[in-house]
Amino acid sequence: MACDEALYRQYLNGDDAGLEALMKKYGDPLTLYIDGYLHDVHEAEELMLDVFAYLFTKKPKIRDGGFKAYLYKAARHMALRHKSKRKPLFSLDALTSEPDGRLLAEEVIRTEERNRILHFCMDEMNPDYREVLYLTYFEDMSYAQAAEVTGKTVKQITNMVYRGKESLRRLLEREGITNAES
C-alpha cells in the first residue's frame, strides 16, 4: 500500500485515485475523532468532508511522515471552531438502538453496560487526557504525531498518556470494573 504522502502527491499531480484512497483510509476514523468533540456523528461526517475539502483545495505542503498528524490537527481545529459556534440539539440517535439478533441477550446487555461505563468514565476524564488516549490507542498515532496534533511536546504526551491511563483506571474501578489493565 502506498504511503499517505505518496497518495497526497499523486492527487496533487492530478490523479484523483490518491484522494479516493486517502478518504477511504481516513474517512471513518477521522469522523469518529471529530465525533469525540461534537457528539453528533452527522455533523462529524460533514466536518470530515470539510477537512478533506480544505486539504485538497488549499493543497498545503506536508512533510514526509506528517500527513496523518496534519489531517488530525486540521480536524481538531475545525471541530473546536465548530463546537464553539453551535448550539446543543436533541439527537434521535441517542434514544435507543436495536440489539444485534445474533448475540445472546445477556451478552448484548453486558457489552452495552461496559460501553456505557467506559464512555461515562471517558467523559469524566480531563479532556486533554481523553484526547491523547484516543489518538494513541484508537488512532494508533505515535507520541510524536499526537504531540503535533495537540501542539504539545512528546514528553508532555508521554506524561499525559500515563496520567490518563491512571485516571481512567481509577474511574473504572469506581464504577466496579476492577480488571482494568494499562
Question: Which stretches of residues belong to each language-model region?
Answer:
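Acidic, proline/glycine-rich intrinsically disordered inter-domain spacer in sigma factors
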Residues: 94-123
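N-terminal module of bacterial RNA polymerase sigma factors
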Residues: 1-29, 36, 123, 170, ...
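Short, small-hydrophobic-rich alpha-helical interface motif
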Residues: 11, 30, 34, 44-55, ...
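Arg/Lys-rich amphipathic alpha helix in sigma70-family domain 2
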Residues: 73-92, 111
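DNA-recognition helix of helix-turn-helix
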Residues: 118, 144-174
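A short pre-motif secondary-structure segment
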Residues: 132-136
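Sigma70-family region 2
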Residues: 12-13, 39, 49-66, 85-87
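C-terminal flanking helix
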Residues: 27, 31, 52, 126, ...
